[in-house]
Amino acid sequence: MSLTLSELQIRTLKQTLESSKIPFKSEVRLDILSSFKIGGICPVVVEPENSNQVLETLFIFHKSEIPWKILGGGSNLLISDHPDNFVTLRLSGKFKEFEYLEGGKFRIGSATNTTPTFRQISQLGYTGAEFLSTIPGWTGGAVIQNAGCYGGELFDLIQTVEFLRNNEIFVRSPSEIKHGYRFTEFLNEKDSIILGIEILLKEGNLEEIQTSLKDKRDRRNSSQPENKKSAGSVFKNPKIFLENGKEIKAWELIDQAGLRGQIKGGAQISPEHCNFIVNVGAATAADVNYLVELILDKVFQTTGIRLNREIEYFGDIP
């Protein structure tokens, strides 16, 4: 485990950020930034509001030898109980905006909230992104994981991705970015930062779009734990098909292993949808990780199939 940041490092960082007029917050409870409502206190959360401030922040981190991690909407994330050995970068300002360009094109900042953003875009009369209105979190995180559901995924709509890598800003098309089912090359690049995307949609019938939005929302609410503290699907579907063409789902394997409803501390494998782990009390990251490892072991013992995590870990988790 990494060493805790020193008081001198933190004090010097704050002074540098203040002189550079880069917004930040001190002693931030990360649990309130997480849909799991799990996470400890981070010494500093830096909130750059434009690309220049992002670049300057990264320069400060590098010069001061400050370890850092980027946090978005916190919806597909398990945050450490002790995030005190790094500072957190969280985009703000212009990154929270989206705008219509022309011909069905929209530019969307990476810190926009996916559910209201894509619902609002759909209600403007543009179709194709309705499924994204059911996915919580921020657009940047949705890009990194190529978020999707109900037969659609974000990279189906993307025209370009703007991102920062090695202190340089790039704009790339999907054909220039490795991506697949719940995967992009950004997942393995911890120093890359998504700044925004442009998507292309078609004009549609507003009444049909409203129906589609409602159908997808109802479908989600009927099949997933509603109003529960969770991080969504814990594991990716294994992409294994039966002879009749039916896809084997991760939740079916977990259920087959007899783990539905299993509890550890304040965390529980959801009785409603066992590919969800929910915080039913004062769950810790360690509680959740225990259940994650239990699922991995039991599913493999029962079926011979190795599941892969969909949720990401943020910081050191025992």
UniProtKB/Swiss-Prot annotation:
It catalyses: UDP-N-acetyl-alpha-D-muramate + NADP(+) = UDP-N-acetyl-3-O-(1-carboxyvinyl)-alpha-D-glucosamine + NADPH + H(+). Residues 213-229 have a biased composition (Basic and acidic residues). Its main location: cytoplasm. It comes from the Bacteria. It is found in: Cytoplasm. NCBIfam families: murB, PRK13905.1. This is UDP-N-acetylenolpyruvoylglucosamine reductase. The gene is murB.
